[in-house]
């Protein structure tokens, strides 16, 4: 029987499964089944990106016909957002991770989108020897000490093993690159805002530290209460400071749309003041929510970890075209990284298959896959060939810079690649 891949909410029954382009019978699955769990927001402003990442995993698994080394792959999609807020919720993320590790067929956990959510789930998957692969988390402290809080990343590794992997560069690279770009663009004074969340404050802190090192004056690095609809009090301070750049560490759900709209309302517009942010803002939903008039008025710049789709070559270019053909739309920012993570997992299962078959229990199966992922080398990825280092990070640091320009269509503007950043 063919089953379609479906998204299920965090409280849905564990039995809601999906087999990608495969047939769940004993002939096609001689060695049984393995399950991959995904977890990120699938509602509110995050629904387009969440769907894009889900599609990316789907793409990677569908390339195998749903069967790897005699094992049928089933994908269980979970939503870690709260129905009340539409944003990620720590309690929901913990429930998702616990649901995955309690499933004797679960082999890998794919997620999260928000770095704060990863802080919740990594220790849970680590205790279960389950590999966790993220398509989007970039907070440095999840894997390394640079740019991290005290105790990180060890506090996320209760077993002492590295089980968390990300095929995307971390913010200690992106935040630094953003500050250097601002310096090269000729900005004289920057006012940093952050959403006081793990990702947003983390990248803002790295931007600040780098700016001070390279001689770019920083007026302040101020945390905002992003739940407040009126950000004009802080923007009035920004205007009085004389800063010619506002840098905001955050994501689209945590105040960026309001900040940009109200920057225009208080006169913080180009050429007097411009706006820059990290890849957590590289979403069409930002343009819709902030309005193109406001975005264009601030002459926005956004940094992104990796290459823009149109600049990819080889595997990246092929994946981009395959995604568009399969889903009839452009990939979202992290959709191809979800595909990359899925392919890493498929490759690891192939290499670990003999150990999985000999394993005495699910912990040994998971450990075999974890070790295989950790040993990933010379992987032909969307941004070229790369390796995982001892922290579970990729060893490339390609970054891109985007601006926003006018465009035809219902939105009225779009992100456009501007430069490769180093």
Task: Show which residues each predicted segment covers.
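Extracytosolic ligand-binding ectodomains
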Residues: 2-6, 14, 22-422
């Amino acid at each position: 029987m063919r089953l379609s891949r479906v998204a299920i909410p965090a409280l849905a029954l564990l039995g809601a499964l999906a087999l990608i382009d495969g047939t769940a019978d004993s002939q096609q699955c001689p060695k049984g089944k393995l399950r991959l769990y995904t977890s990120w927001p699938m509602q509110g402003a995050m629904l387009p990106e969440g769907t894009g990442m889900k599609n990316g995993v789907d793409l990677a698994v569908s390339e195998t016909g749903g069967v790897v080394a005699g094992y049928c792959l089933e994908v269980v999609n979970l939503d870690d957002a709260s129905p009340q807020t539409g944003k990620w919720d720590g309690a929901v993320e913990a429930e998702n991770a616990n649901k995955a590790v309690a499933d004797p067929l679960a082999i890998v956990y794919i997620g999260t989108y928000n770095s704060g959510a990863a802080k919740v789930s990594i220790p849970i998957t680590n205790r279960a020897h389950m590999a966790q692969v993220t398509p989007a988390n970039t907070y440095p402290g999840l894997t390394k000490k640079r740019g991290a809080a005290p105790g990180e990343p060890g506090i996320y590794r209760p077993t002492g093993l590295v089980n968390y992997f990300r095929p995307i560069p971390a913010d200690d690279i992106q935040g630094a690159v953003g500050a250097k770009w601002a310096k090269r663009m000729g900005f004289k004074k920057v006012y940093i805002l952050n959403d006081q969340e793990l990702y947003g404050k983390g990248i803002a802190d790295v931007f600040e530290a780098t700016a001070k090192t390279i001689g770019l004056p920083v007026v302040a690095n101020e945390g905002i209460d992003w739940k407040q609809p009126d950000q004009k009090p802080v923007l009035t301070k920004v205007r009085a400071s004389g800063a010619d750049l506002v840098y905001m560490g955050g994501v689209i759900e945590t105040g960026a749309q309001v900040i940009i709209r109200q920057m225009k309302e208080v006169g913080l517009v180009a050429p007097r003041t411009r706006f820059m942010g990290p890849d957590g803002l590289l979403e069409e939903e930002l343009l819709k929510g902030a309005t193109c008039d406001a975005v264009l008025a601030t002459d926005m710049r956004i940094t992104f970890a990796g290459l823009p789709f149109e600049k990819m070559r080889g595997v990246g270019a092929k994946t981009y075209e395959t995604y568009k053909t399969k889903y009839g739309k452009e990939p979202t920012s992290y959709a191809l990284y979800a595909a990359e993570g899925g392919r890493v997992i498929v490759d690891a299962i192939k290499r670990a298959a003999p150990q999985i078959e000999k394993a005495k229990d699910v912990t040994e199966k998971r450990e075999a896959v974890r070790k295989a992922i950790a040993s990933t080398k010379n992987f032909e990825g969307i941004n070229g060939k790369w390796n995982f280092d001892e922290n579970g990070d990729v060893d490339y640091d390609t970054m891109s810079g985007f601006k926003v320009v006018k465009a035809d269509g219902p939105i009225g503007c779009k992100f456009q690649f501007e430069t490769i950043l180093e």
